[in-house]
Amino acid sequence: MTQDEMKKAAGWAALKYVEEGSIVGVGTGSTVNHFIDALATMKDDIEGAVSSSEASTQKMKALGIPVYDLNSVDRLSVYVDGADEINDRMDMIKGGGAALTREKIVAAVAEKFICIVDNTKQVNILGEFPLPVEVIPMARSYVARQLVKLGGDPVYRQGVVTDNGNVILDVYNLKILNPKELESQINEIVGVVTNGLFAKRGADVLLVGTPDGVKTFTTK
């Protein structure tokens, strides 16, 4: 089974967590694109979706899935999204696609976070994948200096502007032993919008596409 086939299996497996008549939170990325394809097969059974990125919004609209503004929605039963890394405590690094802030907002609203990945994303310790940090443009150099003090090597992601009009610093060489603490430390730096650690609001259910099928993990 190829990596993309494992992503597809995980994406389609998430469909069973979607409630009829509900509005579904939808993330961003290659694995989520498979979930969107799956969601389109039951578009007449749901009210619609809230999207974490312009890319996902465009894909859903093209498939006939109604997309709502989050501010007009009181409740999201589930949020389905991928991860760049996830550990066995369901802490994640996200933001490789630069949609981390909107992803974090939608995840905060949802009652249940379903994370869908292929098995290459599972790790023991977070940090091999560079940690994305969304930054107000004028604060980029200042924030980079503060991230160096935390032990990281920040690199400006050239040519990328987020859906919110900000820039991304990718922080390399972090061995993240306490994800919740580091998430807070980085978010306290003036000029940071948010960072790609999802530890305070981690996943509730993890669906992993493997060569042997989809494996399900849940928080204790």
UniProtKB/Swiss-Prot annotation:
**Keywords per UniProt:** Isomerase
One GO BP annotation is: pentose-phosphate shunt, non-oxidative branch
Pathway(s) the chain acts in: Carbohydrate degradation; pentose phosphate pathway; D-ribose 5-phosphate from D-ribulose 5-phosphate (non-oxidative stage): step 1/1
Extract the SUPFAM superfamilies matched here: D-ribose-5-phosphate isomerase (RpiA), lid domain, NagB/RpiA/CoA transferase-like
Any idea which residues are catalytic in this one? E103
Instruction: Look up the EC number in the record and give it.
Output: 5.3.1.6
* Known role: Catalyzes the reversible conversion of ribose-5-phosphate to ribulose 5-phosphate.
Q: How does it assemble?
A: Homodimer.
Kindly provide the name given to this protein in its UniProt entry.
Ribose-5-phosphate isomerase A
